[in-house]
Amino acid sequence: MRDRLFFLLSKYGIRPNDRIGQHFLIVKDVIDKAIEVAEVSKSDVVLEVGPGLGFLTDELSKRAKKVFTIELDRRIIEILRNEYSWNNVEIIQGDAVKVEWPSFNKVVSNIPYQISSPFTFKLLKMEFERAVVMYQLEFALRMTAKPGDRNYSRLSLMTQALADVEIVMRIGKGAFYPKPKVDSALVLITPKKDRIELNESLVKALFQHRRKVVSKALRESAHMLGIKDVKTVKDILSSVPHSNKRVFHLTPEEVKEIEEYLREHRIIS
């Protein structure tokens, strides 16, 4: 796979573009693991973001009914169209965060790491069965962190309100060319049957002061909720559920209780 990569790069005179996060996956075992965990079968329509030189895409095409792959770099698209004769792969040119996604039921992707947050939040708004995504290890640890953990953040809370997330494989820098500066991880994302839809402005306001207790965090971030004079709602904010709990200990269910209380008192809509 490494030899094939260098051959294609040389043939087309391409140098990986670090500005758009081009780090090509070159270890077959990692590709096989991603497809195995995603449980890709002939009935599946798979979305891939960032096909690279087509190594993962090619394996997906052999196992799935249909593959949609989104790529920003026109040079890469030229290679894919010239080098492969897939009849069940559709290449979409564009920015994966901005373009409209087709319907799919599974995701298998080695995404550019700089789009990790917007990609993930866009994905979690979609209907799908499971996703296996390559992330920077640090990002994956934040996604999967539990309440009270050092890495527990707005990302952790918002992700786990909507899905079960699990690191299934840690991957070293040597699995990519060129080598990234960070280690990576494959993450399995499975949407929850009972998703908890949270007010994003409230979550942002709370996690602006993640180490403070809830009542104080809300007072100090009141402007983010459209509160012009915090004195007028001081008693309401002091009586909020879990008022004395530190923000980074809150579960999605507890944030939902806070949201419903604030909505009941017309602090948020």
Curated annotation (Swiss-Prot):
Q: What does this protein do?
A: Specifically dimethylates two adjacent adenosines in the loop of a conserved hairpin near the 3'-end of 16S rRNA in the 30S particle. May play a critical role in biogenesis of 30S subunits.
A single GO cellular-component term from the record reads: cytoplasm
* The keyword Methyltransferase belongs to this UniProt entry's keyword annotation: yes
Instruction: Give the EC number(s) listed in the UniProt record.
Output: 2.1.1.-
GO molecular function, one example? RNA binding
UniProt keywords (A-Z) are: Cytoplasm, Methyltransferase, RNA-binding, rRNA processing, S-adenosyl-L-methionine, Transferase
Report the superkingdom from the record. Archaea
Supply the InterPro entries for this chain.
KsgA/Erm, rRNA_Ade_diMease-like_C, rRNA_Ade_Mease_Trfase_CS, rRNA_Ade_methylase_Trfase_N, rRNA_adenine_dimethylase, SAM-dependent_MTases_sf
Task: Quote the subcellular location field of this record.
Answer: Cytoplasm
Q: Which family does it belong to?
A: Belongs to the class I-like SAM-binding methyltransferase superfamily. rRNA adenine N(6)-methyltransferase family. RsmA subfamily.
Q: What residues bind S-adenosyl-L-methionine, as annotated?
A: 23, 25, 50, 71, 95, 110
* Name of this protein: Probable ribosomal RNA small subunit methyltransferase A
Q: Does the keyword ATP-binding apply?
A: no
Q: Which PANTHER family match?
A: DIMETHYLADENOSINE TRANSFERASE (PTHR11727), DIMETHYLADENOSINE TRANSFERASE-RELATED (PTHR11727:SF7)
